[in-house]
From Swiss-Prot:
<feature type="glycosylation site" description="N-linked (GlcNAc...) asparagine">
    <location>
        <position position="226"/>
    </location>
</feature>
<dbReference type="Pfam" id="PF13540">
    <property type="entry name" value="RCC1_2"/>
</dbReference>
<dbReference type="GO" id="GO:0016020">
    <property type="term" value="C:membrane"/>
</dbReference>
<feature type="glycosylation site" description="N-linked (GlcNAc...) asparagine">
    <location>
        <position position="251"/>
    </location>
</feature>
<keyword id="KW-0808">Transferase</keyword>
<dbReference type="InterPro" id="IPR011009">
    <property type="entry name" value="Kinase-like_dom_sf"/>
</dbReference>
<dbReference type="InterPro" id="IPR009091">
    <property type="entry name" value="RCC1/BLIP-II"/>
</dbReference>
<feature type="region of interest" description="Disordered">
    <location>
        <begin position="366"/>
        <end position="388"/>
    </location>
</feature>
<dbReference type="GO" id="GO:0005524">
    <property type="term" value="F:ATP binding"/>
</dbReference>
<feature type="region of interest" description="Disordered">
    <location>
        <begin position="433"/>
        <end position="478"/>
    </location>
</feature>
<dbReference type="InterPro" id="IPR017441">
    <property type="entry name" value="Protein_kinase_ATP_BS"/>
</dbReference>
<comment type="function">
    <text>Serine/threonine-protein kinase.</text>
</comment>
<protein>
    <recommendedName>
        <fullName>Putative serine/threonine-protein kinase-like protein CCR3</fullName>
        <ecNumber>2.7.11.1</ecNumber>
    </recommendedName>
</protein>
<feature type="glycosylation site" description="N-linked (GlcNAc...) asparagine">
    <location>
        <position position="136"/>
    </location>
</feature>
<comment type="similarity">
    <text>Belongs to the protein kinase superfamily. Ser/Thr protein kinase family.</text>
</comment>
<feature type="glycosylation site" description="N-linked (GlcNAc...) asparagine">
    <location>
        <position position="260"/>
    </location>
</feature>
<dbReference type="GO" id="GO:0042803">
    <property type="term" value="F:protein homodimerization activity"/>
</dbReference>
């Protein structure tokens, strides 16, 4: 029995320790993360915290002018980080944050950014303009400067690691280990956050326009701009090769090897000099846009080099602190021990904690270890001492608790695997389980070779997690949107000339414009002389668009640039979508054959459908609170210069259903609104709104993509007429053909018959569309199910990465 207890205790303790060590992360040093030294952008000045003195002061050295500058000689700091010609430092104790502007001059200007004796700062992150820090104990986030206020960062998030680049900051959320990004450049922030997706991460480091980090399996992942090869990780598939000490510059990435603490770099030609740094062991590394520096372990000196020509220099600093000095009373909290000679380095004022190496939890065993053979009979009770009994009881209790915890963990893993794998075998909807049976030709239609293709759920829960996108922020207008004057927008549109008119929206006319800074935008102007009812509708639509779009940021939603509200004038400014609306391409009278339009391919149409579905899925599942668009139609799906589809026009949008007391979605009673042909019949007749109303609208759009016909059209045999004949609803026209396995009879002839591999994809889209337009909302799939099916359809087209190439452009769907 004792051997079994010891075995179980050992297993439980091992699992417990692995989980604990997993979260003991060593500090990350990069272009935008706090450390004991930093490289200032734009001036090639390096600043460091000097050791061996009563105060851990900041000493800076200008590598171009060869001069030293001391900042606040009588003040101790725990960490510093640099931005564009400025430096910031957290004072020892974390109660104050100071910054110096014009750091390259002889007399930098000092400013106190933060002071609070109760809420202490811990981790510092500085980008080109923005400054962020986490709060000690809570890991909540505070940000300053660069228009990155507390309102623009992810709300109510706690971070275990943060880092800042040029125009963006990113962090690893404690809640789910996902990467969240924010900043003054929402396009770059969203690109990087989207690139990481739902990959569980443990560290993050930012460069000028890319970011890298270690995932939970120990692999290094880099996302963002790759124009110089800075994302081309050396040995990316080899786990536990690199430590958490990463350093990213403008066009290069550097990392430290776990094996010998040497530095390896790639991108911008930096890899040419890896053989020079192979023999040097570093404590950490830090970078500016064009300069790499490392703290050498043997003598705590700083060596810097240029990644393009390896012109290295050794900075004339005394020994530099390898980590912050903590009070001696706190040194007992150093989980991985105290750094050698800490007393000397901190001049008797404290100790330096060693950085803990990141340990990644091994895959849990498939079953509990088998108990060993029965032990020999225990000694008689008279020979057992009371302490041994107590110890045995304690070990037994610990073993039981540990075993229960381990068993619960294994059950969770098994459940996740079961739902992820087995859900893939379920149909799109439990209540409707269609099967597509298709023969190769009429002569073979009844043969045993006909095969079935089921619409699968694709483990929608797992897929949904992989597709999670950026969160929302404040509801206030000015947090994200610029305010323009009416004269600015009038000038941008040629005084709203007819030649600049490109369409109309929920409350006005849309014009193409060009702002003074050269940005191309779309400007929606509300009707000025509207009747009272129309005026109230315009007010509501205007307020809705600002309220929603100012806090929504997603690749597949049209971005609100700003607004204007002067007297009765109400205008909204959006990113200009160069390729217009999907409706215009599908129903253009000049689009008469396959080569008339780039969208006349099944792969392209499925890709556009997937883009739009991802935007709607974000509104339903990840916006807080959820949002129901209410007007999904092909004219509200716009295409940017790269043919990426984005959902637009939120004038009719409403906050979506929330969970009621019975944990079922609450259906919001509201007056029906939308566009004829796309409006949900259940919503129209019952005035009850749910997110399934958007699903219906998307289903009609899918049918448009398949057939090339309008939502309501006049049908004269195989010819669609503008006048005459009886109006036909696209749903009534398409669904019977799909149900009767006659899909080929309604497909858009301009695209032609599906090529090899596309047939199954088109059928999957057709059956997905059929379920989307089911008369009863409860029988329609969720947006997560739809996205999963469209992703699979795009894969079936022979492109697992969702990329579509043509002679004109290259399109990538993430």
């Amino acid at each position: 029995m004792k051997r079994f207890i010891n075995s179980t205790v050992t297993f439980s303790v091992t699992v417990t320790i692995a989980v604990i060590i997993f979260f003991l992360l060593s500090p990350v040093t990069s272009l935008g993360s706090g450390s004991t030294y930093a490289v200032v952008y734009g001036s090639d000045t390096v600043c460091a915290l000097i050791s061996g003195q009563p105060t851990q002061r900041i000493l800076c050295y200008d590598t171009r002018l060869n001069i030293n500058v001391t900042l606040n000689p009588g003040v101790s700091f725990s960490s510093i980080a640099a931005g564009d010609n400025f430096l910031c430092g957290i004072r020892s104790g974390g109660y104050s944050l100071l910054c110096w502007d014009n750091i390259g001059s002889y007399s930098p200007n000092r400013k106190r950014i933060y002071q609070n004796d109760n809420v202490l700062l811990e981790t510092l992150s500085v980008g080109d303009k923005q400054i962020c820090a986490t709060v000690n104990g809570t890991n909540s986030l505070k940000c300053w400067r660069g228009s990155v206020s507390d309102q623009s960062k992810p709300p109510n998030e706690r971070f275990r690691s943060i880092s800042s680049g040029v125009g963006f900051s990113c962090g690893v959320s404690i809640r789910n280990n996902r990467i969240l990004c924010w900043g003054t450049d929402p396009v770059k922030s969203n690109q990087i956050q989207t690139g990481f997706g739902n990959t569980p991460m443990v560290t993050i480091s930012a460069g000028k326009s890319h970011a890298c980090g270690l995932n939970t399996t120990g692999n290094l992942i880099c996302i963002g701009n790759n124009d110089s090869g800075q994302l081309n990780v050396i040995a990316p598939d080899q786990p536990n090769l690199y430590s958490s000490s990463l350093s990213l510059g403008s066009n290069f990435t550097c990392a430290m090897r776990i094996s010998n603490n040497s530095v390896v770099c790639w991108g911008g030609g930096a890899e040419r000099f890896n053989n020079v740094t192979d023999s040097i062991s570093f404590e950490s590394i830090s970078s500016g846009p064009g300069l790499i520096c490392g703290l050498i372990s043997s003598n705590l000196s700083i060596m810097c080099w240029n990644p393009t020509n390896f012109s290295r220099i050794f900075l004339p600093f005394p020994e530099v602190l390898p980590g912050p000095c903590v009070e001696s009373s706190s040194s007992s909290l150093c989980s991985c021990g105290v750094y050698p000679q800490s007393d000397k380095l901190c001049s008797g004022t404290g100790s330096i904690c060693k950085s803990c190496p990141i340990q990644f939890p091994a895959s849990p065993p498939s079953q509990f270890p088998l108990p060993p053979p029965p032990p020999p009979p225990p000694p008689s009770p008279s020979t057992s001492s009371p302490p041994s009994k107590a110890l045995t009881r304690g070990l037994l209790a610990f073993a039981i608790v540990g075993s229960v915890g381990a068993f619960a963990g294994i059950c969770s893993v098994v459940y996740c695997l079961w739902t992820g794998v087995c859900l893939g075998k379920k149909k799109v909807h439990n209540s409707v389980q269609p099967t597509i049976t298709r023969g190769g030709s009429n002569s073979r239609s009844n043969s045993s070779n006909s095969r079935s293709l089921s619409i699968r759920r694709q483990g929608s829960r797992m897929l949904s997690m992989r597709r999670q996108r950026s969160g929302t922020s404040s509801m206030k207008h000015a947090d994200k949107a610029e305010e323009f004057s009416f004269s600015e927008l009038a000038s941008a549109t040629g005084n709203f000339s007819l030649e600049n008119k490109i369409g109309s929206g929920s409350f006005g006319v849309v014009y193409r414009g060009k702002l003074n800074d050269g940005r191309e935008v779309a400007i929606k102007r509300g009707e000025v002389n509207a009747k009272m009812k129309k005026f109230q509708e315009k007010e509501t639509a205007f307020d809705s668009e600002i309220a929603f779009l100012s806090r929504l940021h997603h690749k597949h939603l049209v971005r609100l640039v700003g607004y204007c509200e002067e007297r009765e004038e109400k205008l909204l400014v959006y990113d200009y979508m160069k390729n217009g609306a999907l409706y215009d391409h599908l129903h253009d009278k000049n689009n008469v054959e396959k080569h008339s339009s780039l969208i006349n391919s099944w792969k392209m149409r499925i890709k556009i459908a997937l883009d739009a579905a991802r935007g709607i899925e974000y509104l339903h599942n990840y916006a807080v609170p959820p949002i129901i668009h209410r007007d999904i139609k092909s004219s509200n799906i716009l295409l940017d210069s790269n043919w990426v589809a984005r959902v637009s026009d939120f004038g009719l949008s409403l906050m979506g259903p929330v969970l009621g007391k019975d944990h079922n979605p609450y259906q919001r009673p509201t007056k029906a609104a939308g566009t004829v042909g796309y409006i949900d019949p259940e919503y129209y007749s019952l005035n009850v709104l749910t997110d399934k109303s958007d699903v219906y609208g998307l289903g009609v759009v899918l049918l448009e993509l398949l057939t090339g016909k309008r939502a309501i059209f006049r049908n004269n045999g195989d010819v669609e007429e503008e006048e005459g004949c009886v109006p036909v609803h696209l749903v009534d026209y398409s669904v019977p053909a799909i149900t009767a396995d006659e899909l080929s009879t309604i497909l858009d002839p301009r695209v032609g018959s599906p090529e090899l591999g596309e047939g199954d994809a088109v059928e999957l889209v057709a059956y997905t569309a059929m379920h989307c337009v089911n008369a009863e909302g409860r029988n329609r799939p969720t947006m997560t199910d739809i996205v999963g099916n469209l992703e699979r359809a795009l894969d079936l087209c022979g492109d697992s990465h969702g990329s579509i190439s043509s002679g004109i452009c290259s399109i990538v769907s993430d």
